Design a protein with these regions (language model features):
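Short, flexible loop segments at the rims of nucleotide/cofactor-binding pockets, characterized by
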Residues: 109-115, 164, 183-188, 225-226, ...
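Non-catalytic C-terminal accessory region of glycerolipid acyltransferases
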Residues: 37, 83, 87, 127, ...
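Short Gly/charged-rich anion-binding patches and loops
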Residues: 44, 121, 145, 174, ...
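Catalytic core of membrane glycerolipid acyltransferases/transacylases, capturing the structured
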Residues: 88, 129-190, 217-220
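Conserved beta-strand termini and adjacent loop/short-helix elements that scaffold enzyme active sites
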Residues: 118-120, 161-163, 187-191, 263-265, ...
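Active-site metal-coordination segments of metallo-dependent hydrolases
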Residues: 42-44, 165-168, 229-232
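A conditional alpha-helix N-cap/helix-loop micro-motif detector
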Residues: 113-117, 140, 167-168, 187-191, ...
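Membrane-anchoring hydrophobic helices of lipid-metabolizing enzymes
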Residues: 1-137, 173-177, 181, 330-331
Protein backbone atom coordinates (compact mmCIF):
# COMPACT_ATOMS: atom_id res chain seq x y z
CA UNK A 1 0.00 0.00 0.00
CA UNK A 2 1.70 3.20 -1.16
CA UNK A 3 1.30 6.03 1.33
CA UNK A 4 1.61 9.74 0.73
CA UNK A 5 1.20 12.79 2.93
CA UNK A 6 -1.90 13.82 0.99
CA UNK A 7 -3.54 10.41 1.46
CA UNK A 8 -2.82 10.48 5.18
CA UNK A 9 -4.15 14.02 5.53
CA UNK A 10 -7.40 13.00 3.85
CA UNK A 11 -7.63 9.79 5.88
CA UNK A 12 -6.92 11.68 9.09
CA UNK A 13 -9.64 14.23 8.38
CA UNK A 14 -12.17 11.49 7.62
CA UNK A 15 -11.19 9.49 10.72
CA UNK A 16 -11.58 12.51 12.98
CA UNK A 17 -14.89 13.77 11.59
CA UNK A 18 -16.82 10.67 10.55
CA UNK A 19 -18.68 8.83 13.32
CA UNK A 20 -17.28 5.35 14.00
CA UNK A 21 -20.53 3.80 12.77
CA UNK A 22 -19.67 5.12 9.29
CA UNK A 23 -15.88 5.04 9.40
CA UNK A 24 -15.48 1.41 10.47
CA UNK A 25 -17.53 -0.12 7.63
CA UNK A 26 -15.56 2.02 5.16
CA UNK A 27 -12.28 0.83 6.65
CA UNK A 28 -13.48 -2.77 6.53
CA UNK A 29 -14.18 -2.52 2.80
CA UNK A 30 -10.86 -0.77 2.12
CA UNK A 31 -8.94 -3.33 4.20
CA UNK A 32 -10.56 -6.21 2.36
CA UNK A 33 -9.68 -4.68 -1.00
CA UNK A 34 -6.08 -4.15 0.12
CA UNK A 35 -5.87 -7.74 1.33
CA UNK A 36 -7.14 -9.22 -1.92
CA UNK A 37 -4.54 -7.42 -4.03
CA UNK A 38 -1.62 -8.06 -1.67
CA UNK A 39 -0.47 -11.59 -2.48
CA UNK A 40 2.89 -11.40 -0.70
CA UNK A 41 1.37 -9.94 2.46
CA UNK A 42 -1.34 -12.62 2.45
CA UNK A 43 1.31 -15.32 2.22
CA UNK A 44 3.30 -13.84 5.11
CA UNK A 45 0.18 -13.63 7.29
CA UNK A 46 -0.90 -17.16 6.42
CA UNK A 47 2.55 -18.47 7.29
CA UNK A 48 2.72 -16.89 10.73
CA UNK A 49 -0.84 -17.98 11.53
CA UNK A 50 0.17 -21.54 10.61
CA UNK A 51 3.09 -21.26 13.04
CA UNK A 52 0.96 -19.96 15.88
CA UNK A 53 -1.84 -22.50 15.42
CA UNK A 54 0.51 -25.46 14.94
CA UNK A 55 -0.59 -26.16 11.36
CA UNK A 56 1.45 -27.74 8.57
CA UNK A 57 4.03 -25.26 7.23
CA UNK A 58 6.25 -25.99 4.22
CA UNK A 59 4.99 -29.57 4.28
CA UNK A 60 6.12 -30.13 7.87
CA UNK A 61 3.81 -30.89 10.78
CA UNK A 62 5.20 -29.12 13.86
CA UNK A 63 6.27 -31.14 16.89
CA UNK A 64 4.13 -30.10 19.91
CA UNK A 65 7.00 -31.03 22.23
CA UNK A 66 9.10 -28.22 20.73
CA UNK A 67 6.34 -25.64 21.05
CA UNK A 68 7.27 -22.82 23.43
CA UNK A 69 4.00 -20.89 23.22
CA UNK A 70 0.41 -21.52 24.32
CA UNK A 71 -1.94 -22.36 21.45
CA UNK A 72 -4.72 -19.79 20.99
CA UNK A 73 -7.98 -20.61 22.76
CA UNK A 74 -9.77 -21.35 19.46
CA UNK A 75 -7.16 -23.89 18.27
CA UNK A 76 -7.23 -26.17 16.37
CA UNK A 77 -8.58 -24.50 13.24
CA UNK A 78 -9.38 -25.76 9.75
CA UNK A 79 -7.90 -24.52 6.49
CA UNK A 80 -11.14 -22.60 5.82
CA UNK A 81 -10.92 -20.95 9.23
CA UNK A 82 -7.29 -20.10 8.53
CA UNK A 83 -8.35 -18.18 5.42
CA UNK A 84 -10.95 -16.30 7.48
CA UNK A 85 -8.27 -15.35 9.98
CA UNK A 86 -6.04 -13.99 7.23
CA UNK A 87 -8.93 -11.67 6.30
CA UNK A 88 -9.31 -10.70 9.95
CA UNK A 89 -5.67 -9.64 10.13
CA UNK A 90 -6.22 -7.19 7.27
CA UNK A 91 -9.37 -5.90 9.01
CA UNK A 92 -7.40 -5.45 12.22
CA UNK A 93 -4.66 -3.60 10.35
CA UNK A 94 -7.24 -1.20 8.93
CA UNK A 95 -8.76 -0.70 12.38
CA UNK A 96 -5.29 0.13 13.73
CA UNK A 97 -4.98 2.98 11.24
CA UNK A 98 -8.47 4.25 11.95
CA UNK A 99 -7.89 4.31 15.71
CA UNK A 100 -4.48 5.93 15.34
CA UNK A 101 -5.77 8.71 13.09
CA UNK A 102 -8.80 9.36 15.34
CA UNK A 103 -6.70 9.76 18.47
CA UNK A 104 -6.06 13.53 18.27
CA UNK A 105 -9.82 14.23 18.22
CA UNK A 106 -10.58 12.28 21.41
CA UNK A 107 -10.88 14.03 24.76
CA UNK A 108 -9.27 12.58 27.86
CA UNK A 109 -12.64 11.32 29.12
CA UNK A 110 -13.51 9.77 25.75
CA UNK A 111 -10.19 7.96 25.62
CA UNK A 112 -10.29 6.88 29.26
CA UNK A 113 -13.75 5.34 28.85
CA UNK A 114 -12.41 3.01 26.15
CA UNK A 115 -9.60 1.56 28.29
CA UNK A 116 -9.34 -1.49 30.51
CA UNK A 117 -6.12 -3.13 31.59
CA UNK A 118 -4.40 -5.92 33.50
CA UNK A 119 -0.97 -5.88 35.05
CA UNK A 120 -0.74 -2.10 34.67
CA UNK A 121 0.95 -1.83 38.07
CA UNK A 122 4.12 -3.29 36.53
CA UNK A 123 4.39 -0.13 34.45
CA UNK A 124 2.58 2.54 36.45
CA UNK A 125 4.26 2.12 39.83
CA UNK A 126 7.86 2.61 38.64
CA UNK A 127 6.78 5.36 36.23
CA UNK A 128 4.94 7.27 38.96
CA UNK A 129 8.07 6.99 41.11
CA UNK A 130 10.06 8.69 38.37
CA UNK A 131 11.78 5.56 37.08
CA UNK A 132 12.01 4.95 33.36
CA UNK A 133 10.39 1.81 31.98
CA UNK A 134 11.19 -0.11 28.79
CA UNK A 135 8.00 -1.42 27.17
CA UNK A 136 8.66 -4.18 24.63
CA UNK A 137 5.69 -4.15 22.27
CA UNK A 138 4.70 -6.03 19.11
CA UNK A 139 3.12 -4.56 15.98
CA UNK A 140 -0.20 -5.35 17.53
CA UNK A 141 -3.59 -3.84 18.30
CA UNK A 142 -3.25 -0.12 19.00
CA UNK A 143 -0.10 0.81 20.91
CA UNK A 144 -0.41 4.52 20.09
CA UNK A 145 -3.80 4.59 21.82
CA UNK A 146 -2.22 3.26 25.01
CA UNK A 147 0.65 5.73 24.76
CA UNK A 148 -1.74 8.64 24.34
CA UNK A 149 -3.84 7.32 27.24
CA UNK A 150 -0.80 7.22 29.55
CA UNK A 151 0.12 10.78 28.61
CA UNK A 152 -3.41 12.18 29.00
CA UNK A 153 -4.78 10.28 32.00
CA UNK A 154 -1.66 9.58 34.07
CA UNK A 155 0.62 12.44 33.00
CA UNK A 156 3.38 9.92 32.31
CA UNK A 157 5.87 10.91 29.58
CA UNK A 158 6.11 8.42 26.73
CA UNK A 159 8.94 8.13 24.22
CA UNK A 160 9.08 5.90 21.16
CA UNK A 161 11.73 4.94 18.62
CA UNK A 162 10.49 5.16 15.03
CA UNK A 163 11.97 3.91 11.78
CA UNK A 164 12.65 6.25 8.87
CA UNK A 165 10.14 6.32 6.04
CA UNK A 166 10.42 7.38 2.43
CA UNK A 167 9.80 9.94 1.06
CA UNK A 168 11.17 12.33 3.73
CA UNK A 169 8.00 14.42 3.78
CA UNK A 170 6.03 11.33 4.80
CA UNK A 171 8.43 10.72 7.68
CA UNK A 172 8.16 14.37 8.72
CA UNK A 173 4.35 14.06 8.76
CA UNK A 174 4.53 11.09 11.11
CA UNK A 175 6.98 12.89 13.40
CA UNK A 176 4.71 15.93 13.62
CA UNK A 177 1.62 13.78 14.13
CA UNK A 178 3.11 11.74 16.96
CA UNK A 179 4.91 14.64 18.65
CA UNK A 180 2.41 17.47 18.34
CA UNK A 181 -0.92 15.64 18.20
CA UNK A 182 -0.25 12.63 20.42
CA UNK A 183 2.23 14.22 22.81
CA UNK A 184 4.90 11.56 22.36
CA UNK A 185 8.65 12.08 22.43
CA UNK A 186 9.50 10.55 19.06
CA UNK A 187 13.11 9.48 18.53
CA UNK A 188 14.08 8.60 14.94
CA UNK A 189 16.29 5.53 14.55
CA UNK A 190 19.78 6.76 13.66
CA UNK A 191 23.31 7.45 14.94
CA UNK A 192 22.13 9.46 17.98
CA UNK A 193 19.11 7.31 18.84
CA UNK A 194 20.84 5.24 21.54
CA UNK A 195 21.89 8.35 23.46
CA UNK A 196 18.42 9.91 23.11
CA UNK A 197 16.66 6.73 24.20
CA UNK A 198 18.90 6.40 27.24
CA UNK A 199 18.23 10.05 28.05
CA UNK A 200 14.48 9.52 27.85
CA UNK A 201 14.76 6.57 30.23
CA UNK A 202 16.85 8.51 32.74
CA UNK A 203 14.24 11.30 32.60
CA UNK A 204 11.54 8.85 33.71
CA UNK A 205 9.79 8.14 30.41
CA UNK A 206 8.00 4.97 29.41
CA UNK A 207 10.00 3.93 26.36
CA UNK A 208 7.92 2.06 23.75
CA UNK A 209 10.07 -0.15 21.55
CA UNK A 210 8.62 -2.33 18.79
CA UNK A 211 10.36 -5.62 19.47
CA UNK A 212 8.92 -8.25 17.13
CA UNK A 213 10.83 -7.39 13.94
CA UNK A 214 14.52 -6.77 13.26
CA UNK A 215 14.45 -3.78 10.93
CA UNK A 216 18.18 -3.06 10.96
CA UNK A 217 19.52 -6.54 10.20
CA UNK A 218 21.86 -6.53 13.20
CA UNK A 219 19.50 -8.03 15.77
CA UNK A 220 19.91 -10.92 18.20
CA UNK A 221 19.29 -14.50 17.02
CA UNK A 222 16.45 -16.14 18.98
CA UNK A 223 13.83 -18.86 18.67
CA UNK A 224 10.50 -17.20 17.89
CA UNK A 225 7.39 -19.27 17.19
CA UNK A 226 9.46 -22.32 16.40
CA UNK A 227 12.05 -20.93 13.99
CA UNK A 228 15.32 -19.10 14.47
CA UNK A 229 15.22 -15.44 13.49
CA UNK A 230 16.57 -12.13 14.79
CA UNK A 231 14.83 -9.59 17.00
CA UNK A 232 16.03 -6.18 18.17
CA UNK A 233 18.53 -6.26 21.01
CA UNK A 234 17.85 -2.64 21.99
CA UNK A 235 15.18 -3.30 24.63
CA UNK A 236 17.39 -5.77 26.48
CA UNK A 237 20.51 -3.61 26.16
CA UNK A 238 18.81 -0.46 27.44
CA UNK A 239 17.26 -2.28 30.40
CA UNK A 240 20.51 -4.04 31.33
CA UNK A 241 22.54 -0.84 31.17
CA UNK A 242 20.05 1.47 32.87
CA UNK A 243 18.47 -0.79 35.46
CA UNK A 244 15.02 0.17 34.14
CA UNK A 245 12.36 -2.57 34.29
CA UNK A 246 11.61 -4.27 30.97
CA UNK A 247 7.91 -5.13 30.62
CA UNK A 248 6.25 -6.85 27.63
CA UNK A 249 3.04 -5.02 26.63
CA UNK A 250 0.27 -5.50 24.08
CA UNK A 251 -2.88 -3.45 23.50
CA UNK A 252 -5.90 -5.41 22.27
CA UNK A 253 -8.82 -3.91 20.38
CA UNK A 254 -12.07 -5.24 21.86
CA UNK A 255 -15.10 -3.90 20.01
CA UNK A 256 -15.20 -0.17 20.72
CA UNK A 257 -12.65 -0.46 23.50
CA UNK A 258 -8.99 -1.20 24.18
CA UNK A 259 -7.49 -3.61 26.68
CA UNK A 260 -3.85 -3.25 27.69
CA UNK A 261 -1.97 -6.28 29.00
CA UNK A 262 1.31 -5.69 30.84
CA UNK A 263 3.30 -8.78 31.80
CA UNK A 264 5.61 -8.80 34.85
CA UNK A 265 9.11 -7.38 34.37
CA UNK A 266 11.63 -9.72 32.80
CA UNK A 267 14.83 -10.70 34.58
CA UNK A 268 17.31 -8.00 33.59
CA UNK A 269 19.84 -8.62 36.34
CA UNK A 270 23.39 -9.12 35.12
CA UNK A 271 24.26 -12.82 35.06
CA UNK A 272 27.47 -12.71 33.04
CA UNK A 273 29.01 -10.94 30.07
CA UNK A 274 26.86 -8.20 28.53
CA UNK A 275 26.59 -9.93 25.15
CA UNK A 276 25.31 -13.14 26.77
CA UNK A 277 22.86 -11.23 28.93
CA UNK A 278 21.47 -9.33 25.93
CA UNK A 279 20.94 -12.64 24.12
CA UNK A 280 19.24 -14.20 27.16
CA UNK A 281 16.91 -11.26 27.77
CA UNK A 282 16.04 -10.91 24.07
CA UNK A 283 15.06 -14.59 24.03
CA UNK A 284 12.87 -13.92 27.07
CA UNK A 285 11.28 -11.01 25.18
CA UNK A 286 10.54 -13.37 22.28
CA UNK A 287 8.80 -15.88 24.56
CA UNK A 288 6.80 -13.11 26.26
CA UNK A 289 5.66 -11.74 22.89
CA UNK A 290 4.56 -15.26 21.93
CA UNK A 291 2.29 -15.34 24.97
CA UNK A 292 0.77 -11.94 24.19
CA UNK A 293 0.31 -12.55 20.48
CA UNK A 294 -1.38 -15.92 21.05
CA UNK A 295 -4.20 -14.22 22.94
CA UNK A 296 -5.48 -12.96 19.57
CA UNK A 297 -3.16 -13.68 16.62
CA UNK A 298 -5.39 -11.80 14.16
CA UNK A 299 -4.35 -8.50 15.77
CA UNK A 300 -0.67 -9.04 14.93
CA UNK A 301 0.24 -6.76 12.03
CA UNK A 302 3.38 -8.29 10.55
CA UNK A 303 3.01 -8.03 6.78
CA UNK A 304 6.69 -8.48 5.89
CA UNK A 305 8.79 -11.67 6.04
CA UNK A 306 9.98 -12.26 9.58
CA UNK A 307 11.76 -15.64 9.38
CA UNK A 308 14.31 -17.09 6.93
CA UNK A 309 11.72 -19.53 5.57
CA UNK A 310 9.43 -16.59 4.76
CA UNK A 311 12.12 -15.07 2.56
CA UNK A 312 12.53 -18.43 0.81
CA UNK A 313 8.77 -18.78 0.28
CA UNK A 314 8.67 -15.34 -1.35
CA UNK A 315 11.73 -16.04 -3.51
CA UNK A 316 13.78 -13.37 -1.72
CA UNK A 317 17.47 -13.48 -0.73
CA UNK A 318 18.11 -14.71 2.79
CA UNK A 319 18.89 -12.14 5.50
CA UNK A 320 22.59 -11.45 5.94
CA UNK A 321 22.72 -12.98 9.41
CA UNK A 322 21.72 -16.40 8.00
CA UNK A 323 24.75 -16.52 5.72
CA UNK A 324 26.97 -15.20 8.51
CA UNK A 325 25.84 -18.02 10.83
CA UNK A 326 26.48 -20.60 8.09
CA UNK A 327 29.99 -19.28 7.53
CA UNK A 328 30.67 -19.24 11.28
CA UNK A 329 29.47 -22.85 11.50
CA UNK A 330 31.84 -23.89 8.73
CA UNK A 331 34.77 -22.10 10.35
CA UNK A 332 34.03 -23.72 13.72
CA UNK A 333 33.76 -27.21 12.19
Amino acid sequence: MELSVRKLQVASALAEHLPPSLARPMVKVASGAFGHRSADERLVIERYLRRIYGLVLDGVTPDPKKQTWPLPEDAPITEAQLEEKVEQVFQSFGRYWLDALRLPSLTMDELDRTFTYEGLEHLIIPAQNGQGVVAAIPHFGSWESASRWLVMTHNIPVAAAVEHLEPPELFDWFLTYRRDQLGLNVIPVGPTAAVELAGALSAGSVLCLLSDRDLTGDGIAVEFFGERTTLPGGPALLALRSGAPLVPVAVFVQGNNHHAVVLPPLDTQRHGRLRADVQRVTQDVAHALEILICRDPTQWHVLQPNWPSDFAALGLPQPGWVQAEKEKGRSDA
